[in-house]
Structure formats: C-alpha cells, structure tokens
C-alpha cells in the first residue's frame, strides 16, 4: 500500500501549502485595510510634483506606511532614471 500512502501524504502536504498561502493572503488584506485613506492621493500628488522636474514612469514612486509599537513610519521610495532628463522650464507670466 505504499502507493496509496504516497497519495495520502501529498494531500496533507498540499493542504498545508494551501493553508499557508491563505494565511499570507489574509495577512496582506489586513495590512491593506489598515492603510490611511489619503495614501493613494498622496502618492499621486507626489508623482505629479516629481514629474514637473524629472521624466519618471507611473510606477516610479511607492509610498508605504508601517506601524510599530508607538510610532508610524511613512516611507517614500522614488526610482529615478539613470540619465536624469529634466523637463524644460516653463515661462512664467
């Protein structure tokens, strides 16, 4: 019955893998739920300001908020191109 045991063993393993994946998904959902509502708008506005001076892509900026015991950390990551191409200055007036 070694063949039968082989299939039974894989079911247990696949159930454990499925459970682990589900736990990861739930953890990500909970993390997303705890984000402030203004975070997407902040990211959009920061991208607009950066684009005034440097040509960057839509996904060049990430804004994350992390909570530790008694503090909150707002992390801003901006990926700049290798050769910085500044935008032409606009005439005021």
UniProtKB/Swiss-Prot annotation:
<keyword id="KW-0131">Cell cycle</keyword>
<protein>
    <recommendedName>
        <fullName>Cell division topological specificity factor</fullName>
    </recommendedName>
</protein>
<dbReference type="Pfam" id="PF03776">
    <property type="entry name" value="MinE"/>
</dbReference>
<dbReference type="GO" id="GO:0032955">
    <property type="term" value="P:regulation of division septum assembly"/>
</dbReference>
<dbReference type="InterPro" id="IPR005527">
    <property type="entry name" value="MinE"/>
</dbReference>
<dbReference type="GO" id="GO:0051301">
    <property type="term" value="P:cell division"/>
</dbReference>
<keyword id="KW-0132">Cell division</keyword>
<comment type="similarity">
    <text>Belongs to the MinE family.</text>
</comment>
<comment type="function">
    <text>Prevents the cell division inhibition by proteins MinC and MinD at internal division sites while permitting inhibition at polar sites. This ensures cell division at the proper site by restricting the formation of a division septum at the midpoint of the long axis of the cell.</text>
</comment>
<dbReference type="InterPro" id="IPR036707">
    <property type="entry name" value="MinE_sf"/>
</dbReference>
């Amino acid at each position: 019955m070694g063949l039968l045991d082989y299939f039974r063993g894989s079911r247990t393993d696949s159930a454990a893998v499925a459970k682990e994946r589900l736990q990861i998904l739930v953890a990500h959902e909970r993390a997303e739920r705890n984000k402030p509502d203004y975070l997407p708008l902040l990211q959009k506005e920061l991208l607009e300001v950066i684009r005034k001076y440097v040509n960057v892509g839509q996904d060049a900026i990430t804004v994350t908020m992390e909570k530790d015991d008694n503090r909150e950390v707002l992390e801003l990551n901006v990926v700049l191109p290798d050769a910085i191409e500044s935008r032409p200055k606009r005439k005021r007036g």
